[in-house]
C-alpha cells in the first residue's frame, strides 16, 4: 500500500492502464468496485476519537477488501461537505489505495472548457485518481478536457438509476431515447482507452441493448 502522506500538486502519478485493469479483473475474477461514500454520521462511534475518523474508516474498509476488489469509488460530495478536513481525508484515502487498484472520483463534473480543465487537473494531477465521473449535458467542450489526460478516464453519465432519469434521459425524441443519443454522440469523442459510461444497475432491461 502507498504511504498516505500528502503529495504536492506537481507530483506525477502512475495511471492504471486498460491492460492493467483487465489483468486485475481476470486475476481476481471480479469486477467489484468498492464505494467509499463515507458519511461521518454513520461510521462506528469508536472511530470518532481518531484524529481523522473518515480516513480511519476508509483504511479499515480498504484493508478488508483490497484482495477482493479491482478498484474503489470515492463520492467526493461526502468529503467536500466537510471542508478542508474532508479534502485531506480524501487525499489520504486515495494515496493509501495505491496504484494496484483503479481509483474513481465520483464527482460528476462538467462545465465550460476552461473550468473542466481545472477540474481535470484537480483530480488527475493534484490527486492520483484514474478516472472521474462526468456529466455530458453541456456538450463536447465540457468533456474533452478530461479525455486529454493520457492514461486517465472519463466515466460519462449515460443512463442513471435515480427516479429523475425519467425527466431527461428517458425522453423519447427523434426515434430514440435521449440517453441513446448521449451514448452515440459521446462515443465519438473518445476511445475505449479513455472513455466509459455510467449505466445504473437498476436498468437491466436497457443494459443488454447498450452493451451491443
Q: What does each model-identified segment do?
A:
Residues 15-100, 194:
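Conserved N-terminal beta1-alpha1 strand-loop-helix module at the mouth
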Residues 45, 111-203:
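Conserved anion-binding
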Residues 57, 61, 89-93, 119, ...:
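A general structural detector for well-ordered alpha-helical segments in enzyme core domains, enriched
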Residues 77-83, 107-116:
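Conserved PLP phosphate-binding loop immediately N-terminal to the Schiff-base lysine helix
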Residues 201-212:
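A C-terminal functional module that forms or caps the active site or interfaces directly
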Amino acid at each position: 500500500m502507498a504511504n498516505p502522506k500528502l503529495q504536492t500538486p506537481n507530483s506525477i502519478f502512475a495511471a492504471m492502464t486498460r491492460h492493467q485493469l483487465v489483468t486485475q479483473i481476470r486475476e481476481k475474477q471480479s469486477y467489484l468496485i468498492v464505494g467509499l461514500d463515507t458519511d461521518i454520521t454513520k461510521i462506528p462511534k469508536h472511530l470518532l476519537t481518531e484524529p481523522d475518523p473518515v480516513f480511519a474508516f476508509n483504511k479499515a474498509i480498504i484493508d478488508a477488501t483490497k484482495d477482493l476488489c479491482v478498484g474503489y469509488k470515492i463520492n467526493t460530495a461526502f468529503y467536500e461537505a466537510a471542508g478542508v478536513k474532508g479534502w485531506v481525508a480524501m487525499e489520504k484515502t486515495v494515496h493509501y489505495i495505491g496504484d494496484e487498484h483503479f481509483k474513481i472520483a465520483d464527482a460528476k463534473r462538467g462545465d465550460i472548457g476552461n473550468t473542466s480543465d481545472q477540474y481535470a487537473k484537480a483530480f488527475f494531477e493534484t490527486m492520483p485518481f484514474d478516472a472521474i465521473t462526468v456529466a455530458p449535458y453541456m456538450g463536447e467542450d465540457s468533456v474533452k478536457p478530461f479525455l486529454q489526460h493520457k492514461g486517465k478516464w472519463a466515466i460519462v453519465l449515460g443512463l442513471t438509476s435515480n427516479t429523475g432519469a425519467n425527466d431527461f434521459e428517458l425522453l423519447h425524441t427523434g426515434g430514440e431515447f435521449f440517453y441513446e443519443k448521449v451514448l452515440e454522440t459521446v462515443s465519438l469523442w473518445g476511445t475505449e482507452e479513455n472513455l466509459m459510461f455510467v449505466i445504473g444497475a437498476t436498468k437491466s432491461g436497457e443494459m443488454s441493448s447498450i452493451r451491443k
